[in-house]
Design a protein with these regions (language model features):
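Core catalytic alpha/beta fold that binds nucleotide/phospho-ligands
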Residues: 1-191
């Protein structure tokens, strides 16, 4: 089977029963997309625990995220990508978390929305930020305030970031609505 060359990166939603480990299911989907038996797919972890495709698929990047009863898996070639999934549920501390972890401009943008739109906007922004951090490979410890998104009616756009993340113009973001009751985001930049 020829190896697909998706661009922008492709992604899928897979049901994942609560309590089950995500990696075997992610590995199976990645293997199917790459035409490789899952048990032969090399997925070593870097020093920060981020999985990386190895061997003949070293030019590819895969990432996954699970929440609730779902799993998102992404795959791209010649890109560094991250994906995040969040189960939609009440988050009464959304504004408190935004003020604590987001940039002041992002928190203000959420606070200036009508009350009914604040939690959904918080969750969309959280997913976007996690997707970038997962692509970067440092996770939340890197700092959610080291880069800034602008939220508009047309979507979310990265406008400023720490030098370690590179040029904001190099980043692409796709918001995902994979299933009712879930939101997600996929972020990538050229490798």
């Amino acid at each position: 089977m020829p190896v697909p060359e998706p661009y922008p990166p492709c992604w899928t939603w897979l049901p994942l029963p609560r309590g089950e480990v995500a990696e075997p299911l992610a590995r199976r989907w990645l293997g199917e997309r790459l035409g490789c038996p899952p048990e032969e797919l090399s997925l070593p972890r870097d020093d920060h625990g981020r999985p990386q495709l190895g061997g003949r698929f070293a030019r590819w990047d895969g990432n996954w995220s699970h929440s609730g009863a779902g799993l998102l898996v992404a795959l791209g070639r010649d890109v560094r990508l991250g994906i995040d999934l969040e189960w939609v549920r009440p988050r009464p501390r959304a504004m408190e978390l935004a003020r604590r972890f987001f940039t002041a401009s992002e928190a203000d943008a959420i606070a200036n929305l009508p009350p009914a739109q604040r939690e959904p906007a918080f969750l969309r922004l959280w997913c976007a930020k996690e997707a970038v951090l997962k692509a970067h490979g440092r996770g939340l410890a890197f700092g959610l305030d080291k880069f800034e998104f602008e939220i508009s009616d047309t979507g979310i756009c990265l406008v400023r970031c720490d030098a370690a993340l590179g040029d904001p113009a190099q980043w692409s973001l796709r918001e995902l609505g994979p299933q009712p009751g879930y939101v997600g985001a996929m972020a990538w930049r050229p490798e």
